[in-house]
Amino acid sequence: MRRALCMMMALLGAVAAAQAQDAQKILETFRRNFAIASLDVKIQILQDAAGGKTAADMGPLFQQAVDFVTDNAGLVSTDARFNQLAEIGAEQIGKMGFAAGRYSVWKLFKATADPQTLAKAAGALGVVGAGDPETISNLNRYVDSQNTLSASGKAPDGAVIAACLQALGKLGDPSSFPVLFSAVNLGYGDQLTAVARNALFAIRGDFAAMLLGVIKDRPLPEKKLALQMAIDSDKLTDDKKAQLAELALDISLHSSAADAAGKGTLRDMRFLAAAGLAARKWSHATPFIIEHLDMTIGEFDKGLVDRNHLLDTMNALGAMSTHDAAVRLTQFLVLINSYTEKGKAYDDQIVFTVIANLGALGDKVAFDDLMYTQYLTYSATVKKAARAALDKLKW
């Protein structure tokens, strides 16, 4: 029995070796014929090889075809048959996953301007480029250049950019996240945006870390969009969302913009980040929320933000549940009390919100100034709120 099994294994090995030799001979025959054939016959050779039983072994032939087209790049625009050769070669390299052909396919990608050939080449690179940093980097740079082109008002070829986006999604490398994120938010149109979004979410790795990279390193509009994506994501914990929001608030507080649009984006990002921190009661961010309040008060005085923004900011500080938050809100109440004592007009809603947050914080640091409201010309509603806040203070 044992001897029979050994004989069977030996026979199978011999058959496999013979088949491999046969496949190699067939490949060599195809390659010799391709080298001497006319363009029409070259196309027929590739078609026969792709449809034959040994198609899986024909990688070097299809690479030879791609190299032939690249070597004759100056003639490609004069004869459509070159494009046909390139498309068959690139597509088959991708189908069989012939990794040795990836650099030839990239050379073709750079050499041709034909959209269909570019799309076929991109599709192949999405397979044979797996694990190859150079191929991934090349595709990243190309998509980034098309994003820049689109942002300037020019429209890249939709089929080509779609194929490149899909290729990056298949490759799934974290280095592609920034360019795919840009593509999602560029306004390519619903169909291309959906392709970009699918590719983005196919990227492997730490989603929070990739969003952090966008918030730290990409242009202002993308920083804001990355923050929004983080807050809305169901892939991140509340702690991760809060950490990203804290970073975004730090950046938006300490960055500058030369134009009105940039300043508006920074302001929007501040309020978005503060809201995200308040919703998660992220007390670690108290210093940034205090700085945010100081900036918001100045903007409110200049008419740059409305009352709701100021109220939201005070509520965000109240959500921090820290002594420092109570100290800053008490300082604000001192200022309002001073204005009121001098007969200046006050906003009931602003005063009420300060007092309500001091009550929620329950810090006795506010005692004296909450008491002082009872001696000023505030409305009965404000005084009642102050008494309620006093009752909540912890001793």
Q: What spans do the regions from the language model cover?
A:
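Amphipathic alpha-helical scaffolding segments comprising HEAT/armadillo-like alpha-solenoid repeats
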Residues: 21-33, 54-75, 98-110, 130-151, ...
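Surface-exposed, active-site-proximal loop segments in enzymatic domains
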Residues: 113
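Positively charged n-region of N-terminal signal peptides that target proteins for export
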Residues: 1-4
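Structural detector for internal amphipathic alpha-helices that build alpha-solenoid repeat scaffolds
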Residues: 32-35, 40-56, 75-98, 107-108, ...
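Predominantly the C-terminal beta-signal and adjacent terminal strand-loop region
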Residues: 375-377, 381
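Hydrophobic alpha-helical segments of integral membrane proteins
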Residues: 14-17, 305
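Bacterial N-terminal signal peptides
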Residues: 6-15
